[in-house]
């Protein structure tokens, strides 16, 4: 039986532990484990690489999120970077406060998206690893499509909470 969630039904999902990718790219000197320096035609970026069941490349943006044009250019270049064998989803993260993150997402194979649950989890986990956010504290993740809440436990288990919202409706002939 699959549960049906209608508009504004709160949902919670417990993900497996956030994991770090094995070493695959030049490490950033003095940086935390999982950090890497990835260079593209648009510049070099200090990133945090994580797995939330799928690969994520988290780019801290202390000065603000990239513009739509920068998101497209940088997101595509990082998602297809040779360091990622099968590509990676890319999250650009602007820490608004220790309990709030603004995030833009570039999904491998899809491009810019309004929201991404695993991306929100990766963004929060990366900011916890960087010491910007804290474990066991709800972290509000602001995405273009809405707000999700992520909590990282002491053992790196990730809990994602948010509303199930209808984005569109349609019919399919089978």
Predicted regions and their residues:
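Active-site proximal loop and beta-alpha junction motif in alpha/beta enzyme cores
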Residues: 1-114, 124-174
